Amino acid sequence: MAVVVAPEDVDRFLTLADSENLQAVPVAVVKAEPRLVMNWNGKAIVDISREFLNSNGAEKHITAAPEKPQPYGRQVNGGFAENYTALADDLNICSKRGLAEQFDSTIGAGTVLMPFGGRNQLTPIQAMVQKISVEKRHTDDCSLMAWGYNPFISEKSPYHGAYLAVIESVSKLIATGAEFSDVYLTFQEYFERLGKDEKRWGKPLAALLGAFKAQTDLGIAAIGGKDSMSGTFEKLDVPPTLVSFAVTTDKVKNVTANEFKKAGDKVVLIAPEYNKNDLPDTASLLAVYGKVTSLLRSGKALACYTPTYGGIAEAVMKMCFGNSLGFKFSDGISLDTIFGYRYGGFLLEVTEGIEGAVEIGKITNDGKISDRGEEISLGRLLGAYEDKLESVFRCNISSTQPDPENFSYIAQDRAAPAVRSAKPRVLIPVFPGTNCEYDSAKAMRDAGAEPEIFVINNRSADKVAESVERFAESMKKAQIVFIPGGFSGGDEPDGSGKFITAFFRNAAVKAEVADLLDNRGGLMCGICNGFQALIKLGLVPYGRIIDTDESCPTLTYNTIARHQSKIVRTRIASNKSPWLAETEVGDIYSVPISHGEGRFIASDELIRQLAANGQIATQYVDLDGNASSDIRFNPNGSFCAIEGITSPDGRVFGKMGHSERYACGLYKNVPGDYNIKMFESAVKYFK
């Protein structure tokens, strides 16, 4: 990253960068002379005038000849079940969950909608929604972003494809609860190599005209964007590509989840009129946008989805998946209506009919999607939908472990601190690769503690030694040490967290850890990467730093052999730990997870000992509250579904789930109780 600073601020900037463990080097000076000069080894290798740079190169001219648009409507052949199965199996529609779960969707503790919603986490969202990031305060403002593009339409008519890409992206925002008034756009374009062919040049021209027409019709502008004209390899050309991204801001309370909520509700279609060019009439479309927003904000509509590539059929199927609900289409709804394009239209779940809307069917609880006597099971559709990319992006592996028992240990008494504190100090070390320090500090601050984020500098041996000395001094003043999550050293080979453990094994730091736990009655916690460090140090389950061996428990690679990011349900198996003092055994809490190495492994004998001593704190459970080995509920294949364990006295707590990522208004499309109150419990421990 290049940063321009005033000359008098350079030294201060370098100092600040060093404090963040970043290398900063002055590389250039801004001068009054209008020339760009670059030197290498004392020799000027570039010396260009500013006037030349401003010219943008030599002027060029080309003739562009857009071709006549071809019909692009979806052709529906065959029966209802046949078309639905083919739809679920289509690469453009099938599940991408195995890919999406490889990316951390909850970092920053601001995710309003998870990528997949419903209790099954299977209904994909149509817009990304995140709270605006604020470090030390809270907000109910959020940003929304959605995209639109159909390559099959753009191939037939780049003009229509670009126009409808804009409509699709904006409609997805409206379906998610946003208001149209403050929507803006940005575009990404990608076309074949153009050369001097007039027809080839006609494709980007037609697409840009379509996008421009959509902007003028809607009265909204595109800001920025990126384009490329290199989409040709030998005789292969990419289809004309203009992807529209729509973005806006709104309040969290207005955000609507997409999945169907309950059986018996009606589903209606509200759609705009289309003009002679087979595009939505602008006045009609804007009226539809206003009506949909009004229905969502009044609570009359419980869920909403705008049909895209797969039409109404795709929307209904995906809305059903989230909560395992079925659907029965109304008589008189043709297959062309069900499977055809419906850009700018909206499906809404309502309890009563809506004036001007077409009732297309009702939600059922029979696990089927049916139309006039022909039906197909939701399970069959889900199988086709998820199996298509299973060999590439795995998500449904089977477990060889039997379902474990639910452990239960009710604490009779708990450890107490040697010194009370109304506002305990929390030391949060930040190692290379740590990425949860802000979320952790905020959770601690909200609970009433005083967090200190301490960046470990490893840019040289001297910097590491200095960090060790300063960290040991900071530990003397702290009551809690909290090791946050992340990917220490990029999740180093042969196990993550090795640098963290090496740091804590330093004699000075090790001595302060012993003093904190043995003499001052302090607390420690590690989440995700921090839990991995606690395990490797022996702090869990043994309560002290030891030389671990093969008999010790460990955390290893997820059985699915990839990163997992989703919401899981965890059951309190023991409330012995001061961190869990506000919970009851049997309570179930939902929590985000994001890790590639979270599989807890230990011998049967050790697990029995931990259970008997109340050191198994939390377990992964299914929708019925039972400990499970099923990959849907136990994301890493942990033995006995163990998610978190403690030291013998409970004062050191390690867990995989990111409980620090809880805040009001998050994860609205995945039901559950997310407030485990572990940070409040830790603060109360010292009072």
Q: Which residues fall in each region the model found?
A:
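Short glycine-/acidic-enriched loop or helix-start segments at secondary-structure transitions
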Residues: Y438, E492-D494, L534-L537, S603, ...
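Catalytic metal-binding/acid-base residues of hydrolase active sites
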Residues: S228, S488, G530-Q532, E597, ...
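Cysteine-nucleophile active-site neighborhood
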Residues: P484, S488-K576
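Glycine/proline-enriched, intrinsically flexible loops and inter-domain linkers
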Residues: M1-G490, F503-A514, C640, T646, ...
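Amide-donor transfer/coupling interface in amidating biosynthetic enzymes
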Residues: E466, R470-E473, A514-D515, D547-K687
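Short, well-ordered, mixed-charge alpha-helical segments that flank or form enzyme active sites
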Residues: P34-L36, S230-T232, K253, Q532-K536, ...
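Active-site glycine-centered loops adjacent to acidic/histidine catalytic or metal-binding residues
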Residues: T306, C528, H658
